[in-house]
Amino acid sequence: MKKQELISFLEEFAPKQYAEHWDNVGFLLGKKEEELSKVYVCLDVQRRSVEEAIAHSCNFILSHHPFIFQGMKSVTGDNEQGRLLLTLAEHKISVFSMHTNFDSVKEGMGDLICSKLSWKKEGVLQEVSPGLEGISQGIGFYTRVDKAFSCEELAAYVKEKAALPYIEYFDSGKPIRKIAVCPGSGKSFMKDVIALGADAYITGDLGHHDAVDALGEGLSLLNAGHYGLERFFVPYMSEQIRRHFPKIDCVEEEEFFVGKIL
């Protein structure tokens, strides 16, 4: 099987036009006409993931976050990105990334996390294009729950459902029924969430001033970390590939929370 066959499947699963204008998704490194051996699926292309891909004889890496994001003027061994690119090329390992396009499509990140939390999606935070067959497509989602949570109860619920080692929460003191979620880094949608009338917002990469501003608007915040919710991309896309290509072996990145809390 050629790499092109897998690339075509991935491009159909999460079309490039659903990506944000600033994003860099798709086939980023390699030759499409080469034979595919094994696929390594990860969140980020970093030293440990490249070494694991080599150790497992994988010649194709599927990542969520794009490895090549901003313009590069040279590829040398003087920095880590250059060293990794040279290593990947030396071992003929291709790289394909599905980022905000995966976040936006039906059966992508939003639906995945909504299912993981056992909720029903009512809509998205930012529509990317008109929904197909009446289904809203876009980044993030919001839902309503029948029984109100306290902020502490919601934090405990999300921590258990998402198997998180830790979660940070900022309590407005209001009962929580309408909940907005954006896996990864969603602080840019804070105003949209407030305008939506949400009682709580679950996302990652939140800081002190984000919390102060949100609490002032009566919005509770849950900081699940950037990796906390997005890490489910790895087993989910591995399963999608196995389902469509039963003869292709997928190696999944082991869970690795970069940050540690004492």
Would you name each region that the model predicts?
Residues 1-262:
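Active-site catalytic microenvironments in core metabolic enzymes, especially phosphate/sugar-handling
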